[in-house]
């Protein structure tokens, strides 16, 4: 069996969704983002997204009707892939797919029941990851035949 490749994602401090588009990281960063809501002392992950452009550009087009259906504070975390150093759109897609499959957010339509990926990865979520698991091993997603 080939050796797994390591991906490290550094998650930003959570920011209010409405103000997140104006943060410095939203202008510079790209990768994965996590939209959650906090209510009654609990946090619920609602959506995982990706962008190979700036976070800000993606969030500007992301105001979803469903967000107004939730009480409480809507927050976003930005996940910057710090390892490997060179990040491709294929890696970003594989990371998004693995996270969606692993946590099954309510408002993601695809990749919740299965997905394909380019390489065999193990993901390490670091920083302010909130409810995101610390480690996601893609090998655990493979259904035995």
Task: Describe the role of every protein-language-model region.
Residues 1-46, 51-145:
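Boundary/linker segments flanking structured domains
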């Amino acid at each position: 069996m080939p050796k797994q490749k390591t991906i490290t994602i550094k998650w930003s401090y959570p920011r209010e969704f409405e103000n997140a588009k104006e943060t410095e990281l939203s202008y510079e960063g790209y990768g994965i983002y996590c939209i959650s809501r906090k209510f009654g002392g609990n946090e619920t992950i609602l959506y995982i997204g990706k962008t190979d452009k700036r976070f800000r550009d993606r969030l500007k087009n992301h105001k979803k009707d469903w967000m107004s259906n939730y009480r409480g504070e809507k927050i976003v975390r930005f996940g910057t892939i710090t390892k490997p150093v060179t990040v491709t759109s294929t890696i970003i897609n594989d990371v998004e797919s693995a996270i969606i499959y692993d946590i099954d957010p309510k408002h993601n339509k695809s990749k919740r029941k299965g997905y394909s990926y380019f390489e065999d990865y193990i993901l390490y979520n670091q920083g302010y990851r909130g409810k995101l698991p610390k480690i996601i091993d893609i090998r655990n997603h493979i259904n035995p035949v």
